[in-house]
Design a protein with these regions (language model features):
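A charged, well-structured terminal subsegment
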Residues: 97, 150-179
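Glycine-rich, charge-decorated loop segments at or immediately adjacent to ligand/cofactor-binding or catalytic sites
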Residues: 43-50, 136-148
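Short glycine-rich anion-binding loops that position phosphate/pyrophosphate groups of nucleotides
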Residues: 8-11, 65-67, 103-106
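Active-site/ligand-binding-proximal alpha/beta "capping" segment
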Residues: 86-122
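Acidic/glycine-enriched connector segments
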Residues: 42-100
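Glycine-rich beta-alpha loop segments
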Residues: 1-57
Length: 179
């Protein structure tokens, strides 16, 4: 199974988010899965990458050519992308399930882009697991409900999103995706 992980590249992250990234990465690696991610060598990207590899998993980094100087040299495979849009497209095509860890606008962009992509595909097996730790994604989830309430979004699309509030719950949802 190939699991995309979207997460922050910032280095000044609170310890609780680092621990969550480590837990998810450890789960991925210990289940012989392959992680597909942004491929960079800093922030939660580096944390989750290290946890996957230490636990026996493999990692595929998808890196825009313009920022390749920051890529993680420990990636098992690196795929270069023309730009950020190409990176997202490649990650979506390579992955079976998508995990969105707490992050900033980049992670939010990846989540929304993936959600939109999945809404136009008939393959309902692909899911998004949103780690809503400390309610970090509450506002976007509320906005989706507003769109549903105003008939701007099909409520059935929300079935593609599984919401976890802890790394442990995220791993339980990942296990369900293996079935």
């Amino acid at each position: 199974m190939r699991i995309a992980v979207y997460c922050s590249s910032r280095t000044d992250i609170d310890l609780q988010y680092i621990q969550s990234a480590e837990a998810v990465g450890t789960w991925i690696g210990s289940h012989s899965a392959t992680m597909v991610y942004g491929g960079m060598n800093f922030g939660l990207m580096k944390v989750v990458d290290s946890a996957v590899k230490v636990s026996g998993g493999k990692v595929i980094g998808v890196v825009p050519i313009s920022i390749k100087s920051g890529m993680n040299p420990e990636n098992d495979e690196t795929i270069f992308a023309c730009d950020l849009n190409d990176r997202k497209a490649k990650i979506m095509m390579l992955s079976d399930v998508f995990v969105v860890l707490p992050g900033g606008y980049g992670s939010l962009d990846e989540f929304i882009t993936t959600f939109a992509f999945l809404s136009f595909t008939s393959d309902s097996s692909k899911k998004i697991i949103l780690l809503n730790q400390n309610n970090i994604y509450d506002n976007i989830l509320q906005q989706m409900q507003v769109m549903i309430d105003n008939a701007m979004m099909d409520p059935a699309l929300l079935q593609r999103i599984k919401i976890a509030v802890s790394a442990e719950e995220c791993c339980v949802l990942l296990r369900e995706c293996l079935k």
